[in-house]
C-alpha cells in the first residue's frame, strides 16, 4: 500500500487532497501546522509515497522548497499543480532523479472541487526522464479513479506557457480591452452595451468577438501570473 502527499493546503491543495483521499491513502502537509491532520500522517508514516502533489504558491524559494519536500517524503514522482514560471519543471528535474510532472490546474477557487472534475487535467513530463512513461500512466490512472479526465502534452514548458498565456493572462487582457472600450464609450457619451451589440452576431457566427465586462480584474492569480513570463524572460 502506498500513499499520496499533497503539499500546500490552500485553495488548490485542499480540493486536490479531498479528491484524492477518496480513492487512495493520502495526507496533507503545510507550513501552517493547524491545517495538518497529524493522526493521519502518523497512520500512513511507513507507507511509501507514490506522488508528491505540489500546490504551494510560486515564490523565489519555490524550487528549494520542492527539493526539501522531495527529501522529506521521497516520492516516486513529483506532480506540480501550481502556476509556475516557464522552465521551472525542467530546473527541478535537473536536481532530482524522480520524474517531475507539471499538471496545470483550471477552475475557480470557490468551486475548485467541482471544476477539477469538469475540466480535463492536462499534464506533461519530459519523455527522456527515466520512468516518465510509468509516471504518466500512473497519474492518468489515479485521476481516472478520481473521475478526472486527463490529456498529456508533449513537454512541460508547453503546458507551463499554456496556463499563463492561454488561460489567466488572456482572460486578463480581454478584461483590459473591455476597460479600454468602456473608457472610449464614456468619453464619447455612448452606451457601452449598445456599442458592443454590434459584435453580437459576429461572435455568434464566428466566435471571435467575445464581449467582456469592464471593471476590476478579479481573481488574485490573473495579474500576478503575468509576472511568471517576465521572470523567465520569454
Feature names for model-found ranges:
Residues 157-161, 171-233:
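Interdomain hinge/lid region at the active-site interface
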Residues 56, 66-67, 75-77, 83-158, ...:
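Rossmann-fold dinucleotide-binding core
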Residues 39-77:
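Rossmann-like NAD(P)-binding element
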Residues 45, 113-116, 209-214:
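Solvent-exposed alpha-helices and their adjacent loops that cap or buttress functional pockets
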Amino acid at each position: 500500500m502506498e500513499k499520496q502527499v499533497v503539499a500546500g493546503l490552500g485553495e488548490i491543495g485542499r480540493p486536490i487532497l479531498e479528491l484524492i483521499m477518496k480513492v487512495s491513502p493520502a495526507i496533507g502537509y503545510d507550513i501552517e501546522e493547524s491545517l495538518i491532520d497529524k493522526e493521519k500522517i502518523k497512520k500512513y508514516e511507513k507507507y511509501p509515497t507514490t506522488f508528491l502533489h505540489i500546490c504551494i504558491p510560486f515564490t523565489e524559494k519555490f524550487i528549494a522548497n520542492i527539493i526539501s519536500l522531495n527529501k522529506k517524503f521521497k516520492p516516486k514522482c513529483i506532480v506540480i499543480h501550481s502556476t509556475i514560471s516557464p522552465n521551472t519543471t525542467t530546473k527541478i528535474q535537473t536536481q532530482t532523479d524522480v520524474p517531475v510532472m507539471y499538471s496545470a490546474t483550471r477552475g475557480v477557487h470557490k468551486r475548485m472541487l467541482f471544476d477539477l472534475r469538469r475540466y480535463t487535467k492536462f499534464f506533461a513530463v519530459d519523455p527522456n526522464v527515466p520512468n516518465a512513461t510509468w509516471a504518466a500512466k500512473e497519474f492518468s490512472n489515479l485521476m481516472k479513479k478520481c473521475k478526472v479526465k486527463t490529456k498529456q502534452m508533449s513537454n512541460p514548458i508547453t503546458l507551463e506557457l499554456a496556463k499563463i498565456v492561454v488561460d489567466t493572462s488572456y482572460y486578463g487582457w480581454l478584461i483590459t480591452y473591455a476597460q479600454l472600450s468602456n473608457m472610449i464609450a464614456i468619453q464619447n457619451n455612448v452606451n457601452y452595451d449598445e456599442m458592443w451589440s454590434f459584435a453580437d452576431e459576429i461572435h455568434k457566427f464566428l466566435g471571435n468577438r467575445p464581449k467582456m465586462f469592464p471593471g476590476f480584474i478579479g481573481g488574485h492569480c490573473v495579474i500576478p501570473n503575468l509576472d511568471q513570463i517576465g521572470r523567465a524572460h520569454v
